[in-house]
């Protein structure tokens, strides 16, 4: 029998009951992901004020925070291998960020190559994956509670070719605690000769 994936991890739904640690996402590539494809349900865009404190009072629970950013949620589609991906949030939340949701609509779920670019357990990881059915590459990077810049070495690209790269990035003002939903989208041309520093906000 062919196994596509299994859960076997504290997935995104646990943030609906209590908050996974801010470094939980950077643990999984070094632990659970070693055993194969994982169902994590990434793609949450409403990262705060998303639940009531009780069914009776229906006051917004301001202490409920998903320790992430929209940029990180998009990166998880590349970092976590899952051949049957999810869009884990409500349509009304995606409708506020349709430019970012376009990435979820278009990102592949199966890959022909994977390159680890940066990694340190519980701290950060970045990787590149090549779409199984095209010549397109995708790069994703995540960090823990500490902001950082990761140098992305594009030497994995085919030599002598130029690629248009669309980037979904945290901003300098993004922070998982108080500004998780700020992001920027930019484009630039890259080749196998390029090294680019990418900023990852806390969370």
Regions found by a protein language model. Name each.
Residues 3-91:
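Glycan-recognition surfaces
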Residues 56-63, 81, 86, 90, ...:
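C-terminal accessory segments enriched in acidic
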Residues 144-202:
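C-terminal beta-sandwich/jelly-roll accessory domains of carbohydrate-active enzymes
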Residues 92-138, 173-180:
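Glycan-recognition and catalytic regions of carbohydrate-active enzymes
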Residues 121-161:
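Carbohydrate-binding surface patches
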Residues 1-4, 100:
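Histidine/acidic-residue-rich catalytic or RNA/ligand-binding cores of hydrolases
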Residues 47-49, 86-88, 95-98, 146-149, ...:
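Flexible loop/turn segments at secondary-structure boundaries
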Residues 79, 139, 203:
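Conserved, mostly hydrophobic/aromatic
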């Amino acid at each position: 029998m062919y196994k596509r994936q299994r859960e076997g991890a504290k997935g995104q739904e646990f943030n609906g009951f209590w908050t996974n640690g801010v470094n939980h996402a950077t643990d999984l590539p070094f632990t659970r992901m070693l055993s194969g494809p994982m169902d994590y349900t990434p793609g949450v865009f409403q990262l705060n004020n998303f639940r009531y404190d009780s069914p009776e009072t229906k006051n917004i629970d301001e202490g409920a925070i998903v320790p992430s950013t929209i940029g990180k949620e998009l990166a998880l589609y590349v970092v976590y291998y899952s051949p049957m991906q999810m869009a884990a949030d409500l349509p009304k939340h995606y409708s506020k960020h349709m430019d970012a949701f376009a990435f979820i609509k278009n990102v592949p779920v199966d890959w022909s190559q994977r390159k680890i670019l940066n990694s340190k357990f519980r701290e950060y990881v970045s990787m590149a994956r090549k779409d199984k059915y095209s010549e397109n590459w995708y790069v994703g990077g995540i960090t823990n509670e500490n902001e950082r810049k990761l140098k992305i070495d594009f030497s994995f690209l085919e030599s002598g070719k130029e690629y248009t790269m669309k980037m979904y990035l945290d901003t300098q003002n993004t922070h998982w605690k108080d500004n998780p939903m700020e992001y920027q989208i930019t484009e630039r041309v890259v080749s196998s000769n390029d090294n680019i520093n990418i900023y990852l906000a806390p969370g």
